Amino acid sequence: MSYFPWLTILVVLPIFAGSLIFFLPHKGNKVVRWYTISICLLEFLLMTYAFCYHFQLEDPLIQLKEDYKWIDVFDFHWRLGIDGLSLGSILLTGFITTLATLAAWPITRNSRLFYFLMLAMYSGQIGLFSSRDLLLFFIMWELELIPVYLLLSMWGGKRRLYSATKFILYTAGGSIFFLIGVLGMGLYGSNEPGLDLERLINQSYPATLEILLYFGFLIAYAVKLPIIPLHTWLPDTHGEAHYSTCMLLAGILLKMGAYGLIRINMELLPHAHYLFSPWLVIIGAIQIIYAASTSLGQRNFKKRIAYSSVSHMGFIIIGIGSITNIGLNGAILQILSHGFIGATLFFLAGTASDRMRLVYLEELGGISIPMPKIFTMFSSFSMASLALPGMSGFVAELVVFFGLITSPKFLLMPKTLITFVMAIGMILTPIYLLSMLRQMFYGYKLFNVPNANFVDSGPRELFILICIFLPVIGIGIYPDFVLSLSVDRVEALLSNYYPK
């Protein structure tokens, strides 16, 4: 048992160190860049050390617990703790944020503010994944919005203000329902608010109230995940944001919705989740097909990748809705797998469009010859995204498939139908990804452009790509490494649904 406040340090360090950026000497952007990257690296190393030496994988209970009284008036505590569900997400956050700060190297305008916002976002994400108090969870959920809004509206494309406003309206609208749910849960059945997750797990509610609470939380997560029809902010946002912001959005922000769905809706409201789960599976299946076919019609290749993200989120929703050991583990695996693959595809799309100043597929063609490295990595990650065996996407989708098929909750006919729909979605994925690769990289179009001096990716970009490629291959070959983190915790969680 470790009594050292590891998690508090992990949550507070980035935002505290980030606020010191403004006091650094004005000697160009180099100082700020190196300072930010060293903070991210330090945070990631601390995180890895704490989890390696102070976290027991065999123990399905909450570990590294911290509980400090914060606001006395209504008994609000700073409660942190992690288990197998949050461990993978926290490590993913550390890994992707460190590489995203390295990806943001070319940013020179207002770089201090940019890096501060990235570090503030880092704190919010770690805080969300490790909070054990419902109100603290909500505060961290909201802490995320402001940095993302500013990163979008200040360092984006031509329509950045439109997409930033759309993002804030959608997410703030979802947060209203979230807050109502938090207050309803905290105030039910007692005079003073009790928001401790440990206490709320044992709380039971009247059926109508539980369904209303579930629905309130679901709307907030449906915006973040996103679940159709609340997904329309995502393509606009990804189309306009700087690619380092896109890495954080695709890699971590979307996963917060899935994490909330498991952590709050599944754990605290099991009866309502049992009722809603068939609908989640149906929506997930529709989402896979709908987003894949919409992606096929996108002219802007950034938006095409954004819709592919929405499609892949469908597998997570199906895994969560299947209420089986295998399905939920598959959903957690897909959270990590898509975190790596989605972030890298946006990074590649951003670096490619920065070089060519073009985003429409019909204007592109023939870039594989001047940019062979970008072409190779783009093809490799597209293969990972379309679930090529040997890469993480394949394992995650396969495990979700098995989870749905073995689910005792669904009859054979609906299972067969949904599996068939998922299979069609998996066939559509290579169609839109390979057609995008063909239009971008093959042909001869760009050689007719005057002074076409394209530069291939340099050592910094290759370093980022290879760093992410290794875990994608690693998870694809040996998924047990990731599954072992969550398997005991998932079993404990599902014992509420199927009592022994």
UniProtKB/Swiss-Prot annotation:
Enzyme class: translocase
The protein's Enzyme Commission number: 7.1.1.-
Membrane-spanning residues: 4-24, 37-57, 87-107, 113-130, 134-154, 167-187, 211-231, 242-262, 272-292, 313-333, 334-354, 386-406, 417-437, 462-482
Pfam name, any one: Proton_antipo_M
Entry GO CC: chloroplast thylakoid membrane
GO molecular function: NADH dehydrogenase (ubiquinone) activity; ubiquinone binding
Catalysis performed (reactions): a plastoquinone + NADH + (n+1) H(+)(in) = a plastoquinol + NAD(+) + n H(+)(out); a plastoquinone + NADPH + (n+1) H(+)(in) = a plastoquinol + NADP(+) + n H(+)(out)
Main location: plastid
InterPro entries: NADH_Q_OxRdtase_chain4, NADH_Q_OxRdtase_chainM/4, NADH_UbQ_OxRdtase, ND/Mrp_TM
Record has Chloroplast as a keyword: yes
Similarity comment: Belongs to the complex I subunit 4 family.
NCBIfam families assigned: NDH_I_M (TIGR01972)
Protein name from the UniProt record: NAD(P)H-quinone oxidoreductase chain 4, chloroplastic
Taxonomic lineage of the native organism: Eukaryota, Viridiplantae, Streptophyta, Embryophyta, Tracheophyta
